[in-house]
């Protein structure tokens, strides 16, 4: 990255063929999973006319993902990571084929959809953990900030494209097309992933998988730096659950259907801008302090969002939250990867990703509870300002993270 530029440099895709292969595979995978994410709720709703059944499928898949992240973390620290990645992707694709075949039946099975959702949630997240653990070896720890920013852009771009494509396919060909293309896309990702070099794990004694996972929890609690990073990540994810209040807040602002879409687009847009303007972030001497301040700032943006007098100001607050949370997330990712021992990378990445899954669910549940006692405006504001207070307390308590200095700021090869 050019030291004089705030803009993200994409040269890592040119100089590191292995990372380029991962970038391509991840983008195709995100689009494929997006097609699945559109098709499953629509098919269940059409079959059952029950939003509860749709919610059950999401809950079951989320539970399978959580277990997959835990198991994947242990496997990524025990077995050659390339094999784990390929096995997880291939097995996940088999589940997509099953969904496609089921959708083509005269009477599709609801039980099959639930079971295959569990299958795909487990194996998809298992591969994600191994891929995250392998990233430092693919790009070098000095390039992790740049790699994280490029990955964030990939996720945001894929998350925008896949629902649009999924909706078009549903309108023109039905859910079977979504499942079929998701399966094809998943198997296509195996082609670039096959070009990856071997990714062996450091030699370490064999131990019971549960004891290995317990060792990761002990490390997390014993290391204030890594523990603080994980805690901040969970709180930021909880704050992003404010989206469950968008429909109710849109009514108070008298927004049209088209304008409501801007609320949902604001945070991803802000996050994309944060990734694009992260050029100097890798050279910060006090990344921990920047992480803490940007996290508190993002909570403040959520607190101000709902009390804005006009919806445009609310959208700006959400975009600001997206930008600040992207800065915090990039620093979390980089410090986690650089400060975690190699033999713990799989399990720590699994735990860090799992707190994103659970943090979102906890945040949505808390906002739902607040919504039962107060207005949507009050719910969003109380949650945001409450998190500001917690963030300020953590700014004081997490001294090791606040004082952490990079003796030689991360540089990149670009």
Curated annotation (Swiss-Prot):
Role played: Component of an export pathway for enterobactin.
An example molecular function term from Gene Ontology annotations: enterobactin transmembrane transporter activity
Membrane topology (Cytoplasmic): 1-21, 77-83, 131-156, 200-218, 278-287, 337-356, 400-414
HAMAP family per the UniProt record, alphabetical: MFS_EntS
Organism expressing this protein natively: Salmonella paratyphi A (strain ATCC 9150 / SARB42)
Listed name of the protein: Enterobactin exporter EntS
GO CC annotations, alphabetized: plasma membrane
Source taxon at top rank: Bacteria
Location of the protein in the cell: Cell inner membrane
Periplasmic side: 43-55, 105-109, 178, 240-256, 308-313, 378
InterPro entries noted in UniProt: Enterobactin_exp_EntS, MFS_dom, MFS_trans_sf, TM_effector
Lineage of the species this protein comes from: Bacteria, Pseudomonadati, Pseudomonadota, Gammaproteobacteria, Enterobacterales
Cleaved signal peptide residues: none
Entries under NCBIfam families matching the protein: PRK10489.1
Record field: transmembrane: 22-42, 56-76, 84-104, 110-130, 157-177, 179-199, 219-239, 257-277, 288-307, 314-336, 357-377, 379-399
Keywords of the record: Cell inner membrane, Cell membrane, Membrane, Transmembrane, Transmembrane helix, Transport
Matching CDD domains: MFS_MefA_like
Location, primary (coarse class): membrane
Family indicated by similarity: Belongs to the major facilitator superfamily. EntS (TC 2.A.1.38) family.
Recorded topology in the membrane: Multi-pass membrane protein
